[in-house]
Amino acid sequence: GKYIMPYFLADFLKLHPDVELILDVTNKSKVIKSLERNEVDFSLVSILPETLTVNRIELMPNRLFLVSNSATEFPEKIYDKNILENIPIILREMGSGTRQSMEQFMLLNNLNVKKKLELTSNEAVKQAVIAGLGCSIMPIIGIKNEITTGNLQIIPVRGLPIQSTWNLIWHKNKNFSPIAKAYLAFLEEYKQDIIKSKFDWTNSI
């Protein structure tokens, strides 16, 4: 989420320079608890909560690819899904939306994956992959620079990328402040322009 939300906030904050904002980057399970306790106005998730009734705005697609460091050779043009059973896999922690997406994919495809390492942020996972500790399935939105510079490579696998959607959600019974209502109106008007200007590159991968 930290790779996305700043771009959906920047122009809004220019229009409302007096607004003070707190942006907390955490995993999905903690995000849902914050909504339940009415501690936040909005949350950004790629998997909708099952235990909480929310409203939402779909922001943009979320695609997760299998990646490794560039020093590891993967010469085939495309691999079968069972490659995931033969390489060390680095996972996010329990409660992470990325972790949940990976586990759903593995369960759906009856894959017995060897967990090499578990880390608590996408940045930590990314650095571990670059260091050669294993491979991981990661959101493309967070690895643009590493793909461009050659520190990471995408391993083409049948059935990947995993497809989901980034949703801005809020509690169904949330009573919004005027500025929160203004932000929703801003998103409805400018969402597509932001996606086109800031994230169009994801369509070329």
Predicted regions and their residues:
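Central regulatory/effector-binding core of bacterial HTH transcription factors
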Residues: G1-L52, L119, I205
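A late-sequence structural motif
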Residues: Y3-I4, Q153-S197, S204
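Ligand-binding cleft/hinge of the Venus flytrap
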Residues: F8-H16, R99-N112
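Hydrophobic hinge/microswitch elements
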Residues: N27-I32, E36-V40, V45-S46, E103-I154
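Short secondary-structure boundary segments
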Residues: I47-L48, S70, I140-G142, G159, ...
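Flexible hinge/capping segments at coil-to-helix
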Residues: T51-M94
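Short beta-strand->loop
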Residues: N55-F65, T149-I162
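Secondary-structure junction motif
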Residues: F74-P75, P88-N109, F176-A180, L184-A185, ...
